Amino acid sequence: TAVAKPGTDQIQYPLAEQKLRIQTKSGIDVEIVLSSQDDRLEVQMQSSGELNDAERVALGNLADAFQDAIDGISAKDPVLNLSGLAKFDSTVLASVDFHSSITLNQKGPQTLDFHADSVSRSVKLDGPLGTLDVSVDMRDSSVWGNSKQRAAAIDNYIKQFDKAASRGNADKALATMFKDAFTQMNSDYVAPSQQPKITLADV
């Protein structure tokens, strides 16, 4: 929520909230929230229970990935850096969710929502930059074959998308983020033996 500067009606930009929510296989929820307004930063962390050693290590291993995701979406020319979060330790953690909301001006917030668990991944982007929605169902092992075949299939999808984007004069920044999302959602599977079924929605 935008907040006016004390004593004025003027909202101080930029406003940002970055949230990482992790659920362990033992059922513990951990949430880390970074909020900033103008030059002020607030950090909150809460856990629904006590973590064991393996869970603490698994969470610690996501620290750089969390920072990469924040740096990417907060950049002057935003990019998606979600690969690190997608490669969470699935032997200890059940799911990872990343939410980002950044408001640079009166045009409203740019939001990003990423989810990954052992069978699915999704990323949704909405705001002034545009809208995209990419989801992957990794339960169908018959769709993409081995890693080499999968890489070739992804490359083919990207080439088709480039042609369609060129014909439709798509926004270059949004097109780049879509390709990043598509590639990252279909790479480095949590369970290598599982292959994904890819679904595309609203670009």
Please report, for each region that a protein language model flagged, where it lies by residue:
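Type III/flagellar secretion export determinants
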Residues: 1-203
